[in-house]
Amino acid sequence: MQISGYTFRLFQSHPLANTSKNICDISSKSTICRLKDVIHIGFKWINDYKLLKNWQDFSALFYKHLKDTDTLDPFYFELLDSASQNWNKQNSKRVAIESYVKLLAHEGRLHNEFECFLCASSIKEDDISLLRAFLPTHKICSHTFGIKKSSLNELFQNKSTLFLNNNEVDRLWYILLEGL
């Protein structure tokens, strides 16, 4: 079977959809194809405004973080996919924080040695403050709220927010929104 050059270019520029159907409609009125039968892949939580807003804020950080890369590791897709599946099963902020810690660990930017980012001395206090990218600091150095060292250790080692209370999760959420 011979494929014309136009049809070949069409399939190159518009790949087949997940259902293995052609998603382009060829029109004799124009040289540009029209997309047909394209639907939004929905989630169970898509109609919940708070969950959707948190998802948009979280996924927008990935655009800013990955926009200049040429190739992407499948890790990023798998991370977002697993987060989207757990988004309505758990507190969405907890899912985002756990995913962010996994991202930092994958990229080698997770600072779990608890050395102050600002003064470069070891943090011996029980409360640790965090800055953007979850950089640890003394409460005195950063003048921000602290989080228990044992809870942060659990978060960084096991990627779990189980031992964080809701106020600490909200604090980490706002730090997360500062950027990846």
Regions found by a protein language model. Name each.
Residues 1-180:
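Non-catalytic alpha-helical scaffolds and adjoining flexible linkers that form interface surfaces
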